[in-house]
Amino acid sequence: MIARVCRLTKHSKPPHLPITLTTPTLFLVVLVLLQLHPICVLVNVDDGGGVTVKAISLLYSRKWNVKVINAVNAGLNASLAARNWTVAPGVNVEVVRPPSYDIDPAQFLDVYLKVLNDDKSLLVVLGPMGNDDAEKLYDTLEENRLVGFGPMTVSTRHEGYMPHLYFLRPEATGESYCPSTLCGESLRVLRQGFMYLDGLLGGSEAYDHAVDFISRMGYSFCCVFTVEDKAGGQGGSSEEFDAVWDEFAGGNPQAVIMFATMKPDAKKFLVRLVSDPRTEDTFVLTPIFLQKSIVSIWKETLEEANVPLHPHRVIQTGSNPLAKEDYIDAIKRFQTEMRNYLTEYKEWSGFNDADHFLKNDADGELMVNGWIAGEVLRRALRSHGWMNTATAFLESLYEQRRYVIDDIVVGDFGGECDSFTSANGATCRCNRGGKNVYMREIAEDYRLQPLVGGHIMTTPLQCHIDPSILRPPLTGLTVDMEDHEELLRGSTQFETGVSTTTSSGKAGEMNSFFLQKVVTDTQKVSNELNTLRQERIVTAVFGIVTKAVLGLPGLTFIDPITPTPHLNSFSRNVIHLSPTLEQQLYVLVNYLSSIRADFPNCVIRGGEAPAIIDALRKTLVTFGLNLSSTVVLTPGDTVGEHLPKSGITFIIGLAVDDIVVIEEHLRIHTKARVLVQFSDIALLYNEFVQAFNNSDGAKHLLFATSLPHWADVDTTSETVRRFHEAVREVEKWTPLSLLGFTTGRLIQENLQNMERVTSDLLVDLFFNQTVITIDDMHYGPYKHYDCIINGVVTADDCMANFGATDISVWSMARALRSDEPLLQNPMSPSLVYTVPNGNALTPAQLAGVVGGSLFVVALAICLSVLACFTLRGTRDNDSAPKEPTGPVTLIFTDIESSTALWAAHPDLMPDAVATHHRLIRSLITRYECYEVKTVGDSFMIASKSPFAAVQLAQELQLRFLRLDWETNALDESYREFEEQRAEGECEYTPPTAHMDPEVYSRLWNGLRVRVGIHTGLCDIRYDEVTKGYDYYGRTSNMAARTESVANGGQVLMTHAAYMSLSGEDRNQLDVTTLGATVLRGVPEPVRMYQLNAVPGRNFAALRLDRELFNDGEDETTTSCSDHSSLRAELSIAAQTIAASLQSLLGTFTPAQRQKALTPFCERCGVTLPRKMGHVWDNDSCQEVIRRIAAKVGHVVDRHAAETRERSVCTLSSGSVIIISNDLSDMIRV
């Protein structure tokens, strides 16, 4: 039987007329006609001929509303008609449609395939529509190697890899994840329910998936409604329904996810939901129903329950945008093509208005759905290569297909492939190209509108929405107090910065930080936040609040800023990132002490004035100062009459009107200085800028802050660089916008490590990590130890909820111009105070104290003399950096080619190395640095001051150059080593081997020591055995790696060390920039600087192939000699020592030998073999013994040649090994 084709010209009737449902009798007649007569295919054919593709439309279902079916098909037609039903040159499409929507799709397809006989090579299928039809048709599609384009189903049973269904929408389970995500991110509801009909659409499976998903987010469903879906579409019994409903409503759900189509029980559920007082305000969130518009369903529900419309209560997911979202380029084109189609074919039933898709949102959404299907079909048919067989076409659809429709992307689609291919980025076993879920809500007048923040995307490389990639959200609040102009503006500035760090809502994004504003006023803010926390999920409150709000229970505050001054009291749920008032006062008073200022005055506003005055006085006394006068202002008072013409005045608690008064006073009285708190600068920044811009008084207004300069376009701060990239508008660069950005960056980065997010877990993050570093901002340590007994703190320094570090003193002039210098370099205040004793002693008490003191002094003298003899080896730790939050500058030194020099000059090296140690230790003392350890001839030195460290390294090179070594042998050996290297390396040019002797003597002399310097935070530990401090972590590793790539006589500084120097310090140094250098174990290149300690020296290229023996991240490393002692021939003495150790330790296990040999390695300066593990084996022990023997043997040979009576010692740090002259005789016995 051959099909008859009805050709359609440009002026013919539309390609499909409105089709309505037929009666059952007519349906049987149609089936008979389909088998006895040819099918009429309505098509637009290119008169020039070409390939014709038949598209069988199964985009209909007997169970679906006709308006839904017509809308989808109208959208499909609009796409194809826009190109005159031609998908490519010479490729036309014929759409084959059923005479009636009452014909069973499966039977329609079977009959049509029989009509075509065996000619199926140019055949595609559109649809099917509906879960039951998709299941019935799949076997037929598979048997005939056909693919159903754009099937519309919502069942979880179709979520596996089914290559004969080409889905353009996300899976139903994925759509159900999105409402759950929305509940936590935007709605922030505490009680979330779930509704499904058992046996319908895989409802129980969808519920199980949803339970698993929200448990990952730290939530659970408060209540579940489910009844069995009865056969024949009949609802369950009223008694069963009522019982289930009462249990569900008793949970007081604030939102319910509804996973069901409009069966009687589902409709009854909605009516109960809107009419029951317990649930009448509940949000309804649902995947798209498909069979009927959610708008129609909701309208019918409210009318039946006689309940008015409450907008924004119903939220629905969809797979495509609404037809009116014309900010999307694809939708703009859709509107043009849809309007043209409906204009040309006005007789199309129900859509005689060309703008129908803009007036009926539900129909418009379905038209977009059909239009996208047409666009995908058109792109899939563009290539001619697949047209030889149906199998070839099927395979072509899964060759990593991605369809780009303007700015809408569908795909990737991929077929069978192995795990290796998948790991390399291929999409495998994926027949679902929908990667976007669009959420919309029913607004006023039953119109659908896009939900703000309701667009969730997955990567095209991810086939299904995996719940594991959806991160638990942190839902934060900011507060806009509209009745206070300055606070509202401050909140807006803070939100400008923090909003750049919040989540985009894309699925799989590691950042899940969401922020919402609460609009209120200063009087209602406490009550509204208290009510909100009882009804909604609130993880934390950020930014500007009132002091009263901080006392609300159950809320967590991250870096709160209050308009009135207050002291910090420890509260676990209040985390400060900015300097507290106590920290600011400490830093400012420290500055006053450094400039030897007179006693300051204090003018203060606020309810905590007495306590703040006490805190200021305590701080001043600590630094040897005191208050000259104090004034507490009452409401309405001004500061002008209380400002002295000279001297220092603290003004704590500013009013807006004070700023102009202060500017005028400082401009006129040049000897006056005013100090204010940073929160006043931040909140009133606009007023300060307006008043002090171009004013001479700007240099005399001071404050303390831990922020880098927010408007420095030439900044070296990583934080500010990121801030400027995020906030492009220069006028929005303010202290509060930068503060918001830094706060958001901290949350953004740390959320990646949180598997669950709650207020308590967020607080735990700070106290568990103790010290937190984000970009170049450092916070901590945060401490909360168990030191409170019966409400009394029993230990000092055991609790800290503040963590600002690197607090510097600025003038207002610097705030206005970033090139103005800091008044005081950054410091991390210890908040250790001197507490004077206010109780005077009676004369008798005083006499007793004096007498007792004399006795104590005499006793102390005796004990001191005794200690000089018994504790001479005790270390002096005064100069050791001990502040865990303060940066430490580490210096590593090493003698170049030391092992080769020992082999060449065993007689000279002991004295040379002793001189080396003595000279370096004298410099350590001179520059108040700290000797951490020596390993062999390498030093590890710590310094509190970066400049002192650089000065030490510079003078080290100069002292070695000027020292009289009493021999030229060392220099001759270095030149010989260079020539030997040049013979082996063609590209190597000896820097000193062929230098003129006179020039050489001005630049080089004796031992060549390489030096590496790096500055950063360390893990500082006190060793009870050595009674000294050691420094661990990335900073020590970086310093060691810097030294390891240097050449002898060269001093290298990292970028961090160089930038830690002040501008004045850097001006005193001669430094050459070496550019970015790749260091082993460091993920990114490090910018290096060379300190030209001896001008004129030239060096070989950096030793970038250098490999450290110790490559661990958390251990201190020191560089080692250039050559292993394994390569040195053992002398007679060394062989004797090796034999002695092997005989002595031969019966020990390897672990016991390791324990015994390790102290010798440390004290003799013997480096361990490369890549040796933590646990030694027999070979490792033998190698270590050989190295010890080689090192000690050199010394024994030298001293044995001089005298038979002397013992020898290694040159390690203060340790001695005695070797008897009779040792060899003892062994021979």
UniProtKB/Swiss-Prot annotation:
Membrane topology listed for this record: Multi-pass membrane protein
Cytoplasmic side stretches: 1-24, 867-1229
Cofactor: Mg(2+)
Residues the entry annotates as binding Mg(2+): D894, D937
Intervals, Extracellular compartment: 46-845
Database matches in CDD domains: Nucleotidyl_cyc_III
Note on cofactor: Binds 1 Mg(2+) ion per subunit.
Single GO biological process annotation from the record: cAMP biosynthetic process
Keywords: ATP-binding, cAMP biosynthesis, Glycoprotein, Lyase, Magnesium, Membrane, Metal-binding, Nucleotide-binding, Receptor, Transmembrane, Transmembrane helix
PROSITE patterns: GUANYLATE_CYCLASE_2 (PS50125)
Enzyme Commission designation: 4.6.1.1
Protein name from the UniProt record: Receptor-type adenylate cyclase GRESAG 4.3
Organism of this sequence: Trypanosoma brucei brucei
The organism's taxonomic lineage, starting at the top: Eukaryota, Discoba, Euglenozoa, Kinetoplastea, Metakinetoplastina
